[in-house]
A protein has these predicted regions:
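Cytosolic C-terminal regulatory domains/tails of membrane transporters and channels
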Residues: 1-87
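Charged, low-complexity intrinsically disordered regions
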Residues: 84-279
């Protein structure tokens, strides 16, 4: 509550027709007055054509089913099992729309992430809010991990998508910002240019162990797919493909976009693989 004035001032400065995301995942608790005030702002923005989505409450527990109940970090056994947040209820609806299974509870079954270079310097704690295709080929999830030790330790929560591709893909990373370039360089990944696509090579950081294999994998169709779609950080290894965007929990709109992107990327990979076989 003490920090609500700062949040209020920020909300007052934003045009009411805007799309806004409020992330409470780093808060120790959120009291009922904050919940009520945020709800009022959500209604105001909605009437003006905007939207406010609240994320991060699913990492906090409540000992009441009231929608504005105080939420705080609670021991697992004290969290009401059916006391889902609005985001979790919306994830259940996404599961129905995409024909997926939804599991909101925490799981330490994270071995499928261990071989990705992205996590080499990170300690994975658990995944939660998992959306899984019945065949197990697609897994969207929120993940909590930490970097550093002691006072330098930083806890991060983000949303990712894992795809177990039908056709094996070479080990590579595709990144637009180059923020993780040093990490992948230390892993022995080389900078790779796609010679027939200079614009693509200028816009994206493509790295990998086997340039020849990667250039063969990045067909004209696959390059055009990446050029014409929203940007995501992508890492491929022998286990599958890991896709992420921002280092925070994704909004419902962003989860839908991530799933849609992943499904279409998998289709594009399968199509290019089939074309390569036919030739």
């Amino acid at each position: 509550f003490l920090n609500f004035n700062k949040l209020k001032n920020n909300l007052e400065a934003i045009p009411e027709k805007s799309d806004v995301i409020i992330d409470f995942s780093l808060c120790g608790f959120v009291d009922h007055s904050v919940m009520e005030n945020v709800d009022d702002y959500q209604e105001l923005f909605y009437k003006k054509g905007g939207n406010i989505e609240v994320i991060g409450l699913d990492v906090l527990g409540a000992d009441s089913k009231h929608p504005f109940a105080l939420r705080r970090l609670l021991p697992i056994h004290k969290i009401l099992p059916d006391n889902k947040t609005k985001r979790q209820n919306n994830l259940s609806l996404i599961a129905e729309n995409f024909d997926l299974a939804y599991q909101s509870t925490k799981s330490v079954d994270c071995l499928f992430l261990e071989n990705f270079i992205y996590f080499k310097t990170k300690k994975i704690e658990h995944i939660f809010n998992e959306l899984t295709e019945k065949s197990g080929r697609f897994r969207s999830f929120d993940v909590t991990f930490s970097e550093g030790e002691f006072i330098a330790k930083e806890v991060v929560r983000t949303t990712m998508l894992f795809i177990k591709t039908a056709k094996s893909a070479p080990a590579f990373t595709l990144d637009k910002e180059g923020l993780l370039e040093r990490l992948y360089a230390l892993a022995g990944y080389e900078d790779i240019d796609i010679e027939s696509h200079k614009d693509f090579s200028n816009r994206f950081y493509l790295r990998g162990e086997n340039p020849k294999e990667i250039r063969s994998f990045f067909t004209n169709e696959l390059v055009r797919f990446f050029e014409s779609n929203a940007y995501y950080h992508i890492e491929s290894n022998k286990d599958g493909i890991l896709i992420s965007n921002k280092e925070r929990i994704a909004s419902i709109k962003e989860v839908k976009a991530l799933l849609d992107f992943g499904i279409r990327l998998n289709n594009a990979i399968n199509e290019t693989s089939n074309e390569a076989i036919s030739h």
